From Swiss-Prot:
It comes from Streptococcus pneumoniae (strain Hungary19A-6). Belongs to the vitamin-B12 independent methionine synthase family. Catalyzes the transfer of a methyl group from 5-methyltetrahydrofolate to homocysteine resulting in methionine formation. 5-methyltetrahydropteroyltri-L-glutamate binds at residues 15-18, 114, 555, 599. The gene is metE. GO terms for biological process: methionine biosynthetic process; methylation. L-homocysteine binds at residues 425-427, 478, 593. This is 5-methyltetrahydropteroyltriglutamate--homocysteine methyltransferase. L-methionine binds at residues 425-427, 478, 593. InterPro entries: Cbl-indep_Met_Synth_N (IPR013215), Cobalamin-indep_Met_synthase (IPR006276), Met_Synth_C/arc (IPR002629), UROD/MetE-like_sf (IPR038071). Binds 1 zinc ion per subunit. Its EC number is 2.1.1.14. One of its GO terms (molecular function) is 5-methyltetrahydropteroyltriglutamate-homocysteine S-methyltransferase activity. Transmembrane segments: none annotated. The active site is at 689 (proton donor).
Length: 749
């Protein structure tokens, strides 16, 4: 039996790629130095996979920014505005992901969306009327050659043509079918070039096949692959799926002339049932049996029981998806062995795949025995008081009174805000000084008194600055917080925190998800100190800033021994206690961020409510259901597809919601109007994920577009996300323009 993985993390064991790339962005190193460092990192990663005994090693799973963007660049799906920039290929590539503002021009970044139900974000290409799809890049060939020079005949990985078309945007007047022939020709050119270089197999990632597919989408898939596979140029083709099962196309899929198919046996509800119904003897089945999205040890007995039921003659063991969704290795962690033994990060998952292969081949008895022992006893006990509190919840605990319309009138009278009130999402830039002071405090080099004095001074500066430019609702800036989930988790029982458990989120940005180890309760007030301090420094309202229970759950590595619903309700009660303490301390506007609400929405619509929304939305309502009617509840949501769950979002019963919608051209506005959305809304008037400052008139035009779709009394003016990662000069310049644009728009009402 052979072993492989779908893909490997890119940032490096210690986020080397992130830090090197950021040096390049700051012009501290050259393009050549960046490319050389990336080449060294790839070699290191391939060597790790090889030394762990994995027999089939992927290549081109590495990316300087995003693998979907890589595919767009490879196939020339690049807007003319970027094509025409007098920049190097690498500079144009980064301009697509980050935007560009300089002497050569000014272009906005492409939109960014969540990658299925993960916290990874992909860059969304756009097919335009004049898009000429052709083979234009060489990264996939360069990296195959690099590996070959190291003595490795790798399996290049590429986004499949169906998923590429399904997840891209299209200019009005063009559609996916228009590009089938040119895209197939470009893929076949890739096949031919790889075959020339000595490749024997290519992996085409078709995650879009695990979603609900219409008849038209199935027809598109079959049209693409019937044409593509008519001439494979001598390559074997592995069609790889993940994040679910392929029930809609299984019968068609197994009859295609592909050589191998990869299935997800972790998240694929019906995968085992499908393959037990029959799998062709002339194809190889890649069994994704080791979870690529969570960090818990694999239960070998359970995995072996699944594998024994697979009727395929030729099986390759693999991960359920790319390992980029988990941290690099547990080797650098400082947990006690009794805790650490329960975790497997990317490198350790290589061991698990190898172990399972060995056990199936009659070896690995010691590994199996050790694994059995690990799962023989309960890992953690229960909090009986918490379980009783949850059991005692009734419908009234999830209902806020009075109803929204009455609260809206009460709050209008209480706050007396102008039309189109201005605010920010919460965080301000975390400078080197802010991070250095936090680190010094954590190391004991700065006393509590000294650290508090620094935070108070920083908050004072930003409160005064917000007053000076005439913001309406202020924020304290979150300078005391390292991360919007970790900061809360550190004040909750049941949480563990890795030292180096970084996972790529978008571009070079990493997040360090905490681990939910046991039952979750609040240990002490978390945000009251600094929120109430900030409110004491101004007569204007200052928002209290909390992370919501669904987002805390979704941006953590969840337990597998209880349901995510039960874990979320535990977190909801902890955050509810914090909301009530903030209210009692005089904080009358409280933002409960649900940035990741959409993230764990099942990929199939039939599962949306029963498996997720029926408990996720009530969990949010539980948090704020008992606040007074004159306390205003805000929430915020990050890049995602929201249009299909607008009624559920309205049902959260917040008073104000802000979306990250500016980068996607405010597409959500039409749906808000169509669904008669009642909650007040701040769609975001500029994109903070790009370092560019919005041009004169740009924010004015965005506000005008918003007001064309949403009644002015319902509209808030804000950036599309927090400003933690931005620089101070660009932040201040952008926010001054925002306030000026809001005032100008008020005069036109």
């Amino acid at each position: 039996m052979s072993t492989t993985i779908v893909g490997f993390p890119r940032l490096g064991e210690f986020r080397e790629l992130k830090f090197t790339t950021e040096k390049y962005f700051r012009k501290e190193i050259s393009e050549e130095e960046l490319l050389a460092a990336a080449k060294d990192l790839r070699a290191k990663h391939w060597n790790i996979v090889k030394e762990k005994g994995i027999t089939e090693i992927p290549s081109n799973d590495f990316s300087h920014y995003d693998n979907f963007l890589d595919a767009a660049f490879l196939f020339n799906v690049v807007p003319a505005s970027v094509q025409n920039l007098d920049l190097s290929d690498l500079e144009r590539y980064f301009a697509l992901g980050r935007g560009y503002q300089g002497e050569k021009g000014d272009v906005r970044a492409l939109p960014m969306k969540k990658w299925f139900n993960t916290n990874y974000h992909y860059i969304v290409p756009k097919f335009e009327k004049d898009t000429q799809v052709k083979l234009a890049g060489h990264k996939i060939f360069d990296e195959f050659q690099e590996a070959k020079e190291l003595g490795l005949n790798t399996r290049p990985v590429l986004v499949g043509p169906f998923t590429f078309l399904q997840l891209s945007d299209f200019e009005e007047g063009v559609k996916a079918d228009d590009f089938v022939d040119s895209l197939v020709a470009a893929y076949q050119e890739v096949f031919a070039k790889l075959a020339e270089l000595g490749a024997t197999c290519i992996q085409l990632d078709e995650a879009a096949l695990v979603k609900d597919l219409t008849a038209e989408e199935k027809a598109l898939f079959l049209n693409l692959y019937n044409k593509l596979l008519a001439d494979k140029k001598g390559l074997e083709v592995l069609l790889q799926t993940y994040f679910g099962d392929v029930r809609d196309v299984y019968a068609d899929l197994v009859n295609l002339p592909v050589d191998a198919i990869g299935f997800d046996f972790v998240e694929g509800k019906k995968t085992l049932e499908l393959v037990k119904g029959g799998f062709p003897a002339d194809k190889t089945l890649y069994a994704g049996i080791v979870n690529g999205k969570n960090i818990w040890r694999n239960n070998y007995e359970k995995s072996l029981a699944v594998l024994e039921q697979i009727p395929a003659e030729n099986i390759v063991l693999t991960s359920s998806c790319s390992l980029l969704h988990v941290p690099f290795t547990t080797a650098n962690e400082e947990f006690e062995p009794a805790l650490l033994n329960h975790f497997a990060f990317a490198v350790e998952k290589l061991d698990e795949i190898r172990d399972l292969d060995a056990i199936r081949n009659g070896q690995g008895s010691e590994a199996l025995a050790a694994n059995k022992e690990l799962f023989a006893t309960e890992r953690v006990g229960e909090n009986a008081e918490l379980r009783a509190r949850i059991a005692g919840l009734t419908d009234t605990d999830y209902t806020r009174l009075p109803a929204f319309a009455e609260r809206e009138a009460i709050q209008e009278e209480a706050f007396k805000l102008p039309a189109l009130p201005t605010t920010t999402i919460g965080s301000f830039p975390q400078t080197k000084e802010v991070r250095a002071k936090r680190l010094a405090y954590r190391k004991g080099e700065l006393s509590q008194k000294e650290y508090d004095a620094f935070l108070a001074e920083t908050i004072d500066e930003w409160i005064k600055w917000q007053e000076d430019i005439d913001f309406d609702v202020l924020v304290h800036g979150e300078f005391e917080r390292n991360d919007m989930v970790e900061y809360f988790g550190q004040n909750l029982s049941g949480y563990l925190f890795s030292k180096n458990g970084w996972v790529q989120s978008y571009g070079m940005r990493g997040v360090k998800p905490p681990i939910i180890w046991g039952d979750v309760t609040r240990l002490n007030p978390i945000t009251v100190k600094w929120s109430s301090y900030a409110q004491s420094r101004t007569n204007k309202p200052v928002k209290g800033m909390l992370t919501g229970p669904v987002t805390i759950l979704n941006w953590s590595f969840p337990r597998e021994d209880i349901s995510i619903k039960d874990s979320t309700l535990q977190i909801a009660l902890a955050i509810k206690d914090e909301v009530l303490d903030l209210e009692a301390a005089g904080v009358k506007i409280i933002q409960i961020d649900e940035a990741a609400l959409r993230e764990k929405l099942p990929l199939r619509r039939s599962d949306w409510y029963e498996d997720y929304l029926d408990w996720a939305i009530p969990a949010f309502r539980l948090v704020h259901s008992t606040v007074a009617p004159d306390t205003q509840i805000h929430t915020h949501m990050c890049y995602s597809e929201f249009t299909d769950i607008i009624p559920a979002i309205d049902n959260m019963d917040a008073d104000v919601i802000s979306f990250e919608a500016s980068r996607s051209n405010l597409e959500i506005l039409d749906e808000l109007k169509a669904k008669n959305f009642q909650t007040e809304v701040g769609p975001g008037v500029y994109d903070i994920h790009s370092p560019r400052v919005p041009n004169e008139g740009e924010i004015d035009n965005t506000i005008e577009a918003i007001l064309a779709k949403v009644p002015s009394k319902k509209v808030w003016i804000n950036p599309d996300c927090g400003l933690k990662t931005r620089g101070i000069p660009e932040t201040k310049e952008s926010l001054i323009r925002l306030v000026e644009a809001a005032k100008a728009a008020r005069e036109k009402l």
